[in-house]
Amino acid sequence: MTAAIHIDRDAEATPADEAFELWVNAVFDHTPAPTPSEISPELSIRCVELDEMTDVNSRFRQKAGATNVLSFPVDPDLTEKTGLLGDILICAPVVTDEAEQQGKDVSHHWAHLTVHGTLHLLGFDHIEDDQAQQMEALEIAILNSLTIPNPYA
């Protein structure tokens, strides 16, 4: 299953469209189809700077400061009818800073956060420990299929 991915950039130093497409579609290779077979899944990815992420994080999560990735899934009934999954917001400066601080390849960190955000659009979460373990295991498997090392190691 190949997703329709709309990519919008308002940030510097972001991956190519082809990279986002590879990472998102790897998620669909490892998860049950989110839509009926005749409907392709569709999502948007927006790459932003610190100010926009700080504003969105405050408005929607009541948290101060920027975070690395936020996902905004649509209602599952709408997804089933239209294929729309939702939106992913990724903060480019946070991704770069975290990769540097954690000693990770920046493209690997972009891949991880894109996979993470896409899984949230599919209903995965990490609020409870068992959910977190399931989601992390799936992220590791997806990234491994892309020859990207375990981000939690």
Sequence positions of predicted segments:
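An acidic/histidine-cluster motif and surrounding catalytic segment
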Residues: 1-110, 121-153
